[in-house]
Structures are given as C-alpha cells and as structure tokens.
Amino acid sequence: MLDHAARTVIMVVQQEWPGEVVSIGPQLPSVTNYLTAVKVREGWFVAKYSILGTSLLSILRGARGPWDRVEAAQRDYIQQPTAQLARERSQLRALAAHARRTEGSLRVPTVIAYQDGVLISTASSGSSLAGELVRGRTAPARLLTDVTAIATALHRDRFLTGELSDSYALAMPHTSIVATFTRKFTGAEASCYLDSLGTGWLGGSARTQLATSFQALREILHPLLRRLPAPVVIYGDLKPEHVLLEACGRQTWIDPGLQPANPAAELAKLLSRITLLLITSRPSLVRMDAVGAAMDLLVTSFVAGHPRPDGITALRRLLVLFLADWANYLASGLSVPPDVVLPLPPMLLAATGQAQSLLGLACEAAASLTIDPARAWGTVLAGTLDLATGQPG
C-alpha cells in the first residue's frame, strides 16, 4: 500500500515539474492519508494521497478487502468527482474565496495540482496552535478567541454554501463526528470492532473493560447524536495542529473537512483535541491552568450566546459531540496493529496509552450529561487537569 502511494506521488510530482530537481521527503505522520513534503527549487509543497477515502489503518486491517482488490477499486475511485481529495481541492478554493470576501485573518494552502488522486498544495508556515497552547507566551484565552472568531465568520458566510453546492465539495458527511461514531460503534460489525480494540496491546480483561466502556458511551451518546440539527457549514476538522499562527496575527488552517453540521461540532472537536493535548503533553502547571481557564471561558461564552433554557440544550449538544470525538479518537488508536508500519501522530500513541483512564472519565461525564450538562463539563475539565498532572481522577 505505501509503495503504491509513494510511486503515485512521485509520478505526479515529476509530471507537474518536468525537468526540475525535486526532493521528496519521508512520509509524514497521519492515520488518514499518505502525506509527504515536496521541495522544488526553493519552494516547499505538501502532497497528499487518499486510498478509497478510507483511513490507512482501515486499509491495513483489511477493511476494504485484500490489496489487489483495493488497488483495482482505487483506479476507478480517483476518477470520481466525489473522491475525498477532489472535494478537498474544491473546499480549499472555496475557503480562499471566503477569506478574500471577508478580508479576515484566515488563510488556507493554495492548490497547485490535483492529478491521479494526488493533491499538491503549498506548504504553510507558522507555529501551530498546539505548540503555542503548550509552550507559548500568548494568553491561551486570546488564542482561542481568535480561532473561534474565524470559525464563527465561516459559519455565517451565506455565500459559502452556494459555492460548495455547485460541486461535490460538501459531500463529506462520513467524516463528521456523528457519522464516525455511528460507523464505529453501531451496526452489524460494531461488536466485532469493539472486541478487537487493543489487540496486541492489552490483555483480555483490559480489552473487555474497554469494550464495556465504549458500549456504555454508545448507549448514552448515540440517541442524542441522532437528534442533532445540522444548520450550518463548519470547517469540520478544526484541531490545534491544523491551525498555524503567523507573527503578523494571521492564521493558516490546513486539512479542511467542510460539512453541514451543528455549529457546536466545531467547538467540540477543538476542545476535545485540546484536552487530549494537555493530557499527553503535560505543560507547566501555570500554562495548564491558563489553558483550562480559556476553555472554560469559551464554553461559558458559547452557552451565554443562547437564550435560556436553550443554553442548557446547547451545552448538552456540545458535550455529546465532545465525548463522541474522544471515543472516536481513542478507538482509532486502539485499532492500530502492534506491527503497524505507519508513522503515527505522537499524541495518538500517548492518548492510546491512557485509554482506560480517558474512557473512565468520559463515562463519568456522560452519566450526568442528560440531567446536568454543566456538571458533566466540570467533570471533564477537572479530570483533564488531573490526568495532565498525573494525579488520580
């Protein structure tokens, strides 16, 4: 699989820059797509290749069949306008138009080419929001306020939906928090999937405990997820590592996943990944407290933006999506084969190592979700800080 992806990327890069001396770097960490850096003259680019729109981990597990069948299907897949990276190309162009229209501080990578399933875009510079939250000097509240302001402007852009509906760019419902949770934890194959999590990493009793925790989350979260309205277009993959900050104050957002969704999903994924970042990176106590306070301020502002009693409903929706994203992320890590050949994100590996504690915290928060969502958020925030400092929950 990886040899096929590498050969395809090299072929497309050479066709895009014939006669140029091109340097192609090693594979970059990702469980979703084949990623690599490309240098041409003095410029840097990123090449991305998707196999059947399915995560590389799923392909390696045989979820789409043996490799010869996958390779044959891939030849047809890359010609489809609904292919994942064909949609991403359209999304990047629509986001660039949004940035020009709003004259805000958002930038996105420039599309250079899309050929044979390979998307080439400009490489982006700047420090990541993840790094700034953990090690930076800027107040976390300011950082997160700036990010959410850009997201809000995106949600309110009534022209964006029209631009995207003219193509297949919004046809990405399978990447949403709700769709991912439904695919992983419900349906005919869910039981086998849950039973397989942790294979090669954990003993039988620990795996049974994990499956029980995931099942408990499914029973609470799935009925609530099914009732969520999806009235706006959201960025869809707003993670701390996908936001790059420039000294001038502008931000570059990479790896979009534009989709119709509840606006709470945007903040839910951002907060979910920040909590995992704190737990796995363990910044200084002062910085950790500042980030925790900034997250709490965001949630308070989010609730205050809804009239009573709608604020309680909005908070419940936010936390349902938050906990579902936690479950999705941990399940991905626990599904990694022990002999996997992929370079994996360090945070995924670190979070997987603490999966039992994280799932225990998620189940505790979920238990009070229906009755008292404010208490559930307090449980999440306090538990995050406890795990990040190595204290028992």
State the predicted function of each range.
Residues D166-P223:
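Active-site catalytic-loop/activation-segment of kinase and kinase-like phosphoryl-transfer enzymes
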Residues G187, G305-G393:
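Helical subdomain adjoining the active site within ATP-dependent kinase catalytic cores
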Residues L52-G53, L57, G62-A72, G117-A139, ...:
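A glycine-centered beta->alpha junction motif in the catalytic cores
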Residues A94-T102, L129-T175, A216-R227:
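Conserved kinase catalytic-core helix
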Residues M1-G117, R227-L228, E246-C248, A374-G393:
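Conserved NTP-binding catalytic cores of kinases and kinase-like/nucleotidyltransferase enzymes
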Residues A230-G236, P240:
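Catalytic-loop of the protein kinase fold
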Residues A264-P307, F322-L342:
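Active-site activation/catalytic loop segments of kinase-like enzymes and analogous catalytic loops
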Residues E241-R273:
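Catalytic activation segment of kinase domains across protein kinase-like and atypical kinase folds
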